[in-house]
Amino acid sequence: MANVVVIGAQWGDEGKGKITDLLSRSADVVVRYQGGVNAGHTVVVGEQTLKLHLIPSGILYPDTQCIIGSGTVIDPKVLLGEVEMLEQLGISTDHLLISQTAHVTMPYHRLIDQASEQQRGSHKIGTTGRGIGPTYADKSERTGIRILDLMDPEGLREQLTWTIAQKNVILDKLYGLPPLDAESVIEEYSGYAERLRPHVVDSSLTIDEAWRKRKNILFEGAQGTLLDLDHGTYPYVTSSNPVAGGACIGAGVGPTIIDRVIGVAKAYTTRVGEGPFPTELHGDIGELLCQRGAEFGTTTGRRRRCGWFDAVIGRYAVRINGIDCLAITKLDVLDDLDEIQVCVAYDIDGERCDHFPSSARSFANCQPIYKTVPGWKQSTSHCRNLEDLPKAALDYLKFLAELMEVPIAIVSLGASRDQTIIVEDPIHGPKRALLYTNGDSSAS
């Protein structure tokens, strides 16, 4: 038995969906523990490309129980749309469970999110406009609507009548927007409640029962470490905790049940939205990475900013999450490059800095210190074993492992399931994989 957390080691969009999908074959339970429809993950199965925002990647395996945990915020309309899409494709959602204590994104959350971002002007933070921040704000202010509240018609009417009256004042006085009709919202969300009811459970109890039966549990994070509310590039962050520690709170489990943390990172770096990005590339190479990597957001369709691999934020992610091993994705995107640069440290006002600075202002002033390594100038998308990789590609992976000081367990070379090198099974294998320490580049 192994209970594993999968987290993003960069700014999100690292390819966690594919990695979670691969690992779900060995998992009995998959738990999404934070975030909402602001995060999207893409899974390619044969000729089908599935884009999901709330439903865990494990939904494709009928024997894998999929849980949307209490740390998430749920837009019922989007969730039910995903359920319908999957069922139209012949994929059952009978094994989907929803935490009764997860909070619900309401229409006023979306309106306030979009209006607030627009008011920021040049100081915008890059929100998706899906209402995530305001939903988490209401959760913190103890005025939010939870899934279990949807299941109580009389209580829901009472709550929403009061809440919408308050929100209408904000919409009118602060943003100049027309009021919401409380009766229409109550009717709409009461309808959602009946459709969701068969899936609603006490998720913490369900997870505990699985753990006591020694089931394999996979905890799936959304976004990435550098978007974490407490540990990311604040204020250009999300409103929840994507880091590994967030799995315990968002799923309702104790830290002692976590056996392993897998960090997912691209072979380069991307970021969507606003905020500092030291290794960002603006020329031809940045455009090549964007086009070859299809770097457009699953949720918003926004173009992702692209840059070289940043080992400083990588080491920070290892430290914050206690990462045991890495999954490196999109190695094939680098196939055509003559040489590749890796940021090994920063220069801040003439001083070398090997660690991630907490201040956004300091981070914005960081100049990357690069080490240049040779490219391999040949396709890697067909490789299925380490021995199949060009020597320069293998050397690149070794270099990343040395810089991050953790082993590499998985290498992804394309969107399809089979375009993957499994160096070591992160769930059932020992904690070794590709490990390089003290400058030793031999596999252990």
UniProtKB/Swiss-Prot annotation:
Homodimer. PROSITE patterns: ADENYLOSUCCIN_SYN_1, ADENYLOSUCCIN_SYN_2. The keyword DNA repair does not apply. Pathway: Purine metabolism; AMP biosynthesis via de novo pathway; AMP from IMP: step 1/2. Substrate binds at residues 298-304. The active site is at 13 (proton acceptor), 41 (proton donor). Binds 1 Mg(2+) ion per subunit. Its EC number is 6.3.4.4. SUPFAM superfamilies: P-loop containing nucleoside triphosphate hydrolases (SSF52540). Pfam families: Adenylsucc_synt (PF00709). GO terms for molecular function: adenylosuccinate synthase activity; GTP binding; magnesium ion binding. Its main location: cytoplasm. It is an enzyme of class 6 (ligase). Its cofactor is Mg(2+). Keywords: Cytoplasm, GTP-binding, Ligase, Magnesium, Metal-binding, Nucleotide-binding, Purine biosynthesis. Plays an important role in the de novo pathway of purine nucleotide biosynthesis. Catalyzes the first committed step in the biosynthesis of AMP from IMP. This is Adenylosuccinate synthetase. GTP binds at residues 12-18, 40-42, 304, 330-332, 412-414. IMP binds at residues 13-16, 38-41, 128, 142, 223, 238, 302.
